[in-house]
UniProtKB/Swiss-Prot annotation:
Biological processes, Gene Ontology terms: DNA-templated transcription elongation; regulation of DNA-templated transcription elongation
Biological source species: Thermotoga petrophila (strain ATCC BAA-488 / DSM 13995 / JCM 10881 / RKU-1)
Cited InterPro entries: GreA/GreB_C_sf, TF_GreA/GreB_CS, Tscrpt_elong_fac_GreA, Tscrpt_elong_fac_GreA/B, Tscrpt_elong_fac_GreA/B_C, Tscrpt_elong_fac_GreA/B_fam, Tscrpt_elong_fac_GreA/B_N, Tscrpt_elong_fac_GreA/B_N_sf
Similarity comment text for this entry: Belongs to the GreA/GreB family.
Transmembrane parts of this sequence: none
Listed PANTHER family: TRANSCRIPTION ELONGATION FACTOR GREA
Matching NCBIfam families: greA, PRK00226.1-4
Keyword Transcription regulation in annotation: yes
Name of the protein: Transcription elongation factor GreA
Function noted in UniProt: Necessary for efficient RNA polymerase transcription elongation past template-encoded arresting sites. The arresting sites in DNA have the property of trapping a certain fraction of elongating RNA polymerases that pass through, resulting in locked ternary complexes. Cleavage of the nascent transcript by cleavage factors such as GreA or GreB allows the resumption of elongation from the new 3'terminus. GreA releases sequences of 2 to 3 nucleotides.
PROSITE patterns to which the protein is assigned, alphabetical: GREAB_1 (PS00829), GREAB_2 (PS00830)
Name of the gene: greA
Coiled-coil regions listed: 1-32
Molecular functions (GO terms): DNA binding; RNA polymerase binding
């Protein structure tokens, strides 16, 4: 499998999720399965079926995270510069509306719009990578082409 690029923050978040899932997998779900078995006939036991399904889902996620972490390449904060790279925060201005937005450019695995984390694989993320303060980018959106100017780039 090829390397998966993650910020330090994204790597630590996945490690914590893995620990939490393993704890849940080992104790909570196992206990639910045990309790459901004690109810008798497993062929019509919805609690047992639900617990087994949850066990499968959690087990799959554990394997997925372990795969990601074992192939992770951590992106450390780089030197201060005005170039947009992975892990950097960027302030952009929509030249059509005047609205400003602040995002951190992250890998697709870490993207979270509500936490201001923009995927480097998104149309806007792709167009911003490698740009510098003052550069203008054009992005195709459902509402038409949007123009953004890079106003600031920072590590934090």
């Amino acid at each position: 499998m090829k390397k998966v690029r993650l910020t330090r923050e994204g790597y630590e978040k996945l490690k914590k999720e893995l620990e939490d899932l393993k704890r849940k997998f080992m104790y909570e779900i196992s206990e639910r399965i045990k309790e459901a078995r004690e109810l008798g006939d497993l062929s019509e036991n919805s609690e047992y079926e639900a617990a087994k399904n949850e066990q499968g889902r959690v087990g799959s996620r554990i394997m997925e995270i372990e795969q990601i972490l074992s192939n992770a390449e951590i992106i450390e904060d780089s030197e201060e510069s005005d170039e947009v790279t992975l892990g950097k925060w960027v302030v952009i201005k929509n030249l059509d509306t005047g609205e400003e937005h602040k995002f951190r450019i992250v890998t697709p695995q870490e993207a979270d719009f509500f936490a201001q984390k923009l995927s480097s694989d998104s149309p806007l993320g792709k167009s911003l990578l490698g740009r510098k303060v003052g550069d203008v980018v054009k992005v195709k959106a459902p509402s038409g082409v949007q123009r953004y100017q890079v106003m600031a780039v920072m590590n934090k």
